[in-house]
Amino acid sequence: MKNKFYLHEFQIFDGEAWITFNIVDLNELKNEISVAITNRGKITVVTYDLYKDENGYYFEYGCEYTKININDFKEIK
């Protein structure tokens, strides 16, 4: 699954701007995901805990713990 999602992209609107996530690393053994986050022109790479529910794998983003589902990421060509 690691290479399947490499650099796949997802965008979310936070009420003011679009935030873009790109998967850099997905480690099921450690239950971690590293994503490059582009937020208002600033790019950061952050590692989050990876969770699983009935809809698949996800991580929680921001102070409101927004659920970001891995299956929502799309390959950019």
Where are the regions a protein language model picked out?
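Short intrinsically disordered terminal tails
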Residues: 1-4, 74-77
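Short aromatic-glycine-(Arg/Gly/Cys) micro-motifs in beta-strand/loop hairpins
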Residues: 4-15
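Acidic, low-complexity, intrinsically disordered interaction modules
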Residues: 13-70
